[in-house]
Amino acid sequence: MKRSRSQNLITEMILLLRVSLHPFVVDGCKWCLTAYPKGYNFIGYLSLYLEVADNGSLPFGWRRHARYTLTLVNQNSKKSFQPNEVQEWFDDSIKWGCPSMFPLNEIHAKDSGFLVNGELKIVAEIDILEVIGDVDVSEGISTVKETIHVNGFQLLPSQAKSVSHIFERHPEIASEIHPKNSSLRTGYMSLLLSLIETLSQSPQELSKDDLCDVYIAIGCMKNAGFKLDWLENKLYEVAQKKEDDEAGETRLREMEEKLKDLKLKCSKMEALVEEEKAKVSAAKAHLSFDDVV
């Protein structure tokens, strides 16, 4: 039986819909935590799940029997939140966890100790009880990811081009940021890319809650020293477009209803006109005396 303890950080990601945390290796398998900061089927709760990473590429028939605990760390005290220990079988179609891990309002509560400086800390502890199928993932290899340094930020290759363009257009964006920890800096930059991606959607695809979340996230990044006036302006533009779109849709529905009523009135009037034409035509017809002469 092999026991492993992994600590994961969600950095300002509490505003996003889904966050997949960095995988860690236990007994030859890569495991990962997936967090749903807005809840998954349980709105208003942090949802947290554990699964074997890249399970679709693993050999046919593999399974892992594991006992695990997921802990939400209170960073201001020793009173962390830890649900009961769970024992389950994992395979390529199953992930286990807690859909209602912890209420979001308590996480966001002032001085709660869970969300500190935009950072939520989660600890996963896993005991492997039984192994079916050989996976053999190297711990040294699996935990290393290729990264690229862009203007002092350690990024994934897929992020580097976008971030380079951001610095070209806004060279002062990170000139006064406070965090020095590379993981925190990477987390902030990932959040920025997510915000840009969100605002790139059409106004119809975004809810008012989405725009409110973006506003809060921008505020968090500005508090960390990022210069994001340009992104705030984009947010206001998108919000205005959404407002104009909704107002236009409302006017259009009202006009369509009026047009429908007018068409109905016209249809009734046309029927009356035809009826009146028939009466006029009958009145103009010559009288017949066949019945009397």
UniProtKB/Swiss-Prot annotation:
SUPFAM superfamilies membership: TRAF domain-like
UniProt keywords, alphabetically: Coiled coil
Coiled-coil residue windows: 227-285
InterPro entries with a match to the protein in the record: MATH-CC_domain_protein, MATH/TRAF_dom, TRAF-like
Pfam families assigned: MATH_2
KW DNA damage (keyword) present: no
Source organism, top-level taxon: Eukaryota
Domain annotation MATH: ranges: 3-126
Protein name as annotated: MATH domain and coiled-coil domain-containing protein At3g58400
Protein source organism: Arabidopsis thaliana (Mouse-ear cress)
